[in-house]
């Protein structure tokens, strides 16, 4: 066993998450780094229990062979969640503390909005958590704050540019963009050459431009109706979903309707998650499209001259944050993109660094948001395309509770007591719901990976119900199916899962297969994904048709697709449980995160700014003023 890992003594019943987290004294993060053989030159400390791992750590280990790569998805969940994060952490505790393997957990950074709202935190649960969990769930090392700042700088640049273009002639605008120096000479800043190149202007001096070229260069002529970029903040605030800006007396009546999204919905978060280097991040940030000109041309952050400044604000955020689990295994926390309008996976750079750190025979386990129809699909078709990495094993987390729901059980509603059907034995209801599990197994196997079903056991589950899930999983083609009790028993409760994962990784026989090639049309890619859901066809609204035509004309049809749909059904209708088929998938709109690198069709209506419930989680949260420890965080 490594020097940093430990085995917990557990008690029953399982205490509250925050009480368990506070009962374990974390190791100084330098001890975790030392156990991973990270040179102190390659990380920066953020207090005692967090460190930023620098990209230079990857550069130093480039010759090192990668470890095994494992992704954790799940069946179609209930609104309560089925424990993917807890299973991810529990598995890694089993691999590191009980099976003596080198392992790194790679997780998304949670938004503080849901932490204070209805969902609570995302550090795992019970005896399988990331600690300190209050630091994990709140500010961490400031990455989300950096995203908020850079996103809003770009938003300010957009409206400011419209304002100044409205009130100035072409010549006056150009003269202010390229002011003379003390010697009276004008010059272009470095970022301006990006726009000149885009316009096909090869001249290097402002004095050489013709009046027509001056107009093309200086006047972006942004169509306000086309602007898709919104301001963000990391708080659930429903009253900011739709606002009017520009109502001050100095703005000369230039009002515009817009709104706020939650920070993790920003395209900059998706860029952070999909970037592979600082240079790559600079290019992606500069290519972000904020809207169109009145002539229909895409306007980018680099056109506004702000791409470099955005990168400067994000320069520290590109480095993953090192933390630890309750049992002392290492965790890299990095990026937290939405799983609907974005791809819902932690960062590529964290995974790449982790795979080098664990080396041959080690394990990197990462979680994909929502069910495997969404999270694992996007992991394979978007994240793995850009990273060039290939997973050997995919886990599908299932619960008896969710399977009963898919078998026809009563609705599961967050905040309400569970119906008796979910806390008493009903094997036939479980078996009926296994059609959902079978669909997730077959979909995931199609990528060429070995699939393991991890049955996340609850105290009310019976042996007969658990055995039914295991049998059905094996009959459906799973490599293995394992019952886990890591929530109640820490890594010890996931040892069998760890053994199964090792066997699955050692016995991979197929290459990674994508669901679709990139060189087909946008509609063809959408329809390939819809078919994997069980749809018989796709129906496009007039708006969706218009957007697909626009993105194709603008040269973006070769990007992967990031479907934005409900996580509560394979279909577009959250009420359709099990494995619905033969439905027509409606595409309401199609939008693009061009800098991040994907097109996202909207299936139904998606909120990008959550609201607070009547009784938010913040009612439970307080601080012990004597010890400084947080109470009530979950």
Swiss-Prot record:
Pfam families: FTHFS (PF01268). GO terms for biological process: tetrahydrofolate interconversion. The keyword Nucleotide-binding applies. InterPro entries: Formate_THF_ligase, Formate_THF_ligase_CS, P-loop_NTPase. One of its GO terms (molecular function) is ATP binding. It catalyses: (6S)-5,6,7,8-tetrahydrofolate + formate + ATP = (6R)-10-formyltetrahydrofolate + ADP + phosphate. GO terms for cellular component: apoplast; chloroplast; cytosol; nucleus. Pathway: One-carbon metabolism; tetrahydrofolate interconversion. Keywords: ATP-binding, Ligase, Nucleotide-binding, One-carbon metabolism. ATP binds at residues 78-85. Belongs to the formate--tetrahydrofolate ligase family. Homodimer. This is Formate--tetrahydrofolate ligase. The gene is THFS.
């Amino acid at each position: 066993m490594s020097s940093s890992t430990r085995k917990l003594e557990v008690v029953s019943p399982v205490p509250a998450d925050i009480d368990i987290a506070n009962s374990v004294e974390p190791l100084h993060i330098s001890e975790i780094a030392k156990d991973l053989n990270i040179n102190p030159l390659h990380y920066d400390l953020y207090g005692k229990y967090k460190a930023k791992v620098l990209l230079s750590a990857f550069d130093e280990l480039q010759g090192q062979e990668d470890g095994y790569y494992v992704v954790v998805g799940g069946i179609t969940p209930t609104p309560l969640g089925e424990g993917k994060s807890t299973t991810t952490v529990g598995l890694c505790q089993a691999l590191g503390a009980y099976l003596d393997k080198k392992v790194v957990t790679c997780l998304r950074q949670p938004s503080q909005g849901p932490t204070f709202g209805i969902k609570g935190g995302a550090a795992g649960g019970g005896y399988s958590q990331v600690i300190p969990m209050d630091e994990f769930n709140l500010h961490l090392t400031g990455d989300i704050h950096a995203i908020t700042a850079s996103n809003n700088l770009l938003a300010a640049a957009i409206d400011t540019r419209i304002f100044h273009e409205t009130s100035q002639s072409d010549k006056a605008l150009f003269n202010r963009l390229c002011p003379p120096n003390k010697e009276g000479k004008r010059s272009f800043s470095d970022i301006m050459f990006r726009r000149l190149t885009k316009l096909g202007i090869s001249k290097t001096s402002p004095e050489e431009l013709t009046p027509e070229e001056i107009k093309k260069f200086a006047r972006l002529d942004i169509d306000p109706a086309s602007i898709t970029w919104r301001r963000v903040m990391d708080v659930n605030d429903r009253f900011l979903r739709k606002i009017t800006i520009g109502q001050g007396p100095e703005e000369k009546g230039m009002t515009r309707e817009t709104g706020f999204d939650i920070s993790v919905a920003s395209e900059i978060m998706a860029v952070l998650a999909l970037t592979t280097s600082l240079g790559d991040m600079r290019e992606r940030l500069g290519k972000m499209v904020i809207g169109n000109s009145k002539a229909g041309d895409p306007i980018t952050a680099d056109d506004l001259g702000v791409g470099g400044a955005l990168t400067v604000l994000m320069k520290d955020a590109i480095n993953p944050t090192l933390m630890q689990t309750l049992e002392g295994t290492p965790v890299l926390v990095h990026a937290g993109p939405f799983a609907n309008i974005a791809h819902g996976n932690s960062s590529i750079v964290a995974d790449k660094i982790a795979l080098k750190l664990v080396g041959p025979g080690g394990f990197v386990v990462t979680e994909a948001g929502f069910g495997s129809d969404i999270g694992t699909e996007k992991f394979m078709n978007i994240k793995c395309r850009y990273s060039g990495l290939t997973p050997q094993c995919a886990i599908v987390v299932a619960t008896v509770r969710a399977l009963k729901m898919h078998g026809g059980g009563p609705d599961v509603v967050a905040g309400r007591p569970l119906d008796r059907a979910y806390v008493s034995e009903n094997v036939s209801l479980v078996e009926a719901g296994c059609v959902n599990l079978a669909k997730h197994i077959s979909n995931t196997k199609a990528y060429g990976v070995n699939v393991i079903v991890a049955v996340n056991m609850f105290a009310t589950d019976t042996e007969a119900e658990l055995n039914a899930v295991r049998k059905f999983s094996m009959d459906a083609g799973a490599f293995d199916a394992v019952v886990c009790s890591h929530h109640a028993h820490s890594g010890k409760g996931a040892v069998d899962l760890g053994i199964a994962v090792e066997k699955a990784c050692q016995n991979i026989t197929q290459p990674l297969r994508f669901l679709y090639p990139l060189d087909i049309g946008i509609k063809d890619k959408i329809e390939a994904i819809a078919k994997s859901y069980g749809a018989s066809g796709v129906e496009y609204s007039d708006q969706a048709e218009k957007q697909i035509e626009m993105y194709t004309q603008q040269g973006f049809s070769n990007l992967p697709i990031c479907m934005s749909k409900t996580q509560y059904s394979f279909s577009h209708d959250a009420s359709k449980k099990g494995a619905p088929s033969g439905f027509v998938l409606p595409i309401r709109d199609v939008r693009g995160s061009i800098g991040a690198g994907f097109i996202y069709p909207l299936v139904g209506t998606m909120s990008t700014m959550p609201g607070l419930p009547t009784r938010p989680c913040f009612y439970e949260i307080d601080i012990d003023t004597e010890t400084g420890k947080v109470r009530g965080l979950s």
